[in-house]
Amino acid sequence: MGFRVLVLIVMVTTSALPFTFSEESGRSPFRPALRSEEAQALRHGLTLLLARRADGQTPDMHQPEMRRPEMRRPEVRRPEVRQPEFAESPVGQKRWDAYDCIQFCMRPEMRHTYAQCLSICT
């Protein structure tokens, strides 16, 4: 019961008190406390938290829907890096995989470490 009251107080505070005191010189003593997006994200997170708590699940702040939108990591695809010496082979020959690339890269005449070859080939 106490947890729900605390959450409701926070939700009401973010929507009912849009201003806080600011002591910066040259500005109005009042400024918006939270941008509307921040307040909306906070309310959304608290609503999800209450729903999970009501279902008996423990809240997991690492799940993307519990984070503020600007904290979510965008889905990034790692671009494929093509090295000139490891170019695609002609038709009929086996295409190199990362293991073959590392084996070639670590030959003594290449003078690369395993870590360097791993970063080159993957």
UniProtKB/Swiss-Prot annotation:
One of its GO terms (molecular function) is toxin activity. Disulfide bonds join 101-121, 105-117. Residues 53-89 are annotated as: Disordered. The keyword Transmembrane does not apply. Residues 62-85 have a biased composition (Basic and acidic residues). Keywords: Cleavage on pair of basic residues, Disulfide bond, Secreted, Signal, Toxin. The cysteine framework is XIV (C-C-C-C). Belongs to the conotoxin R superfamily. This is Conotoxin flf14c.
